[in-house]
C-alpha cells in the first residue's frame, strides 16, 4: 500500500482482497476506508482525520478521476476499486457472516430483501439502524456489545464520510472481531428505495458516476468537488516533489 496525496491507498485489487481475507480468517479486527475526493480533501485539512484514515487495514480508491490523476503523475496503471463493486463481490461469495449497521429502517428492510435474493443466509443476519447523532454521541459500548454477540466476519457501516471513518475508529477498541467497511451509500444503492441511487450503467462504463452524484445531490456534492479542485494544485505539486525525492534516493 503506497501513500498518495498524503493518504495510504492500495491500487492492487488482489492485494486488497488478500488483506481482507487474511484479517477475516485470522479473526483480526480493523476497518477499510473508501477514498474519494471528499474524504481525501478532509484528510489533507484535518490531521486527526488523516491519522484515522491511515490507521486502516487497507484503503481502496473509490474515485475513477482520482485514480486517473495519480496514474498520470506516477506513470503507472492505477485504476479505481469502487466500494459498491467490492460490496457486491463479497455478498456474492455467500461465505461470510455479516452485520449491516447504519442508515434507516426502511433502507435496511429493502436491503435485506434484495441481498437475500443473492445469499439466502442474509435473511437471518443482523441489520441495525443508527439514530441521527453526532459522531461523539453514539453509545459505542452498546453498539459493540450487539456486534460481539453476533460475531460477524464483516461489519458494513453506512454513515457517509467523514462520519463513518471516525465512527469505525471509535468503535474498533470495543470489538472482539470483525472487519468494518465504511462505504457510505452502498446500502441505498442496493436497497433501491429512497432518493439516492447508483448512476446508470452507461455512466459507470464511461467513469461518469461523479457527474451523476453532482446531478443527484448538487447541494451536497458540488461544494465537495469545488473544495477538492481548490486543493488539487497543491496536492499535485506535493506529489511531484515526493516523487522526485524518491527517484533521487533510488540507486
Predicted feature residues:
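A short helix->loop->beta-strand "cap" motif at the edges of active sites that frequently abuts
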Residues: 29, 96, 175-179
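Proline-aspartate-enriched helix->loop->beta-strand connector
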Residues: 147, 151-161, 177
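Short Gly/Thr/Asp-enriched flexible loops that form oxyanion-binding sites at enzyme active sites
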Residues: 112, 165-174
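Short, flexible loop segments at boundaries between secondary-structure elements
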Residues: 130-135, 176-214
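N-terminal nucleotide/polyanion-binding subdomain common to many enzyme families
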Residues: 1-79, 84-85
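A transmembrane-helix-recognition feature enriched in membrane-embedded lipid enzymes
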Residues: 67-68, 198-251
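Short glycine-rich anion-binding loops that position phosphate/pyrophosphate groups of nucleotides
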Residues: 37-40, 159-164, 185-186
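Conserved beta-alpha
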Residues: 67-146, 150-151
Amino acid at each position: 500500500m503506497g501513500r498518495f496525496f498524503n493518504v495510504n491507498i492500495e491500487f492492487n485489487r488482489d492485494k486488497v482482497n488478500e488483506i481482507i481475507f487474511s484479517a477475516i480468517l485470522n479473526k483480526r479486527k480493523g476497518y477499510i476506508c473508501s477514498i474519494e475526493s471528499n474524504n481525501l480533501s478532509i484528510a489533507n485539512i484535518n490531521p486527526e482525520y488523516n491519522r484515522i484514515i491511515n490507521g486502516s487495514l487497507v484503503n481502496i480508491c473509490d474515485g475513477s478521476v482520482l485514480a486517473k490523476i495519480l496514474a498520470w503523475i506516477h506513470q503507472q496503471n492505477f485504476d479505481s476499486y469502487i466500494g459498491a463493486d467490492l460490496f457486491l463481490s463479497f455478498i456474492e461469495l455467500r461465505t461470510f457472516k455479516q452485520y449491516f449497521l447504519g442508515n434507516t429502517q426502511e433502507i435496511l428492510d429493502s436491503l435485506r430483501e434484495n441481498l437475500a435474493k443473492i445469499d439466502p443466509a442474509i435473511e437471518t443476519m443482523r441489520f441495525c439502524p443508527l439514530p441521527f447523532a453526532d459522531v461523539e454521541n453514539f453509545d459505542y459500548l452498546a453498539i459493540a456489545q450487539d456486534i460481539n454477540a453476533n460475531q460477524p466476519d464483516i461489519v458494513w457501516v453506512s454513515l457517509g464520510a467523514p462520519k463513518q471513518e471516525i465512527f469505525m475508529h471509535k468503535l474498533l477498541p470495543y470489538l472482539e472481531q470483525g472487519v468494518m467497511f465504511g462505504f457510505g451509500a452502498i446500502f441505498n444503492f442496493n436497497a433501491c428505495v429512497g432518493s439516492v441511487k447508483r448512476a446508470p450503467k452507461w455512466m459507470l462504463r464511461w467513469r461518469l458516476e461523479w457527474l451523476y452524484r453532482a446531478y443527484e445531490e448538487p447541494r451536497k456534492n458540488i461544494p465537495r468537488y469545488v473544495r477538492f479542485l481548490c486543493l488539487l494544485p497543491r496536492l499535485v505539486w506535493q506529489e511531484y516533489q515526493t516523487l522526485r525525492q524518491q527517484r533521487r534516493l533510488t540507486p
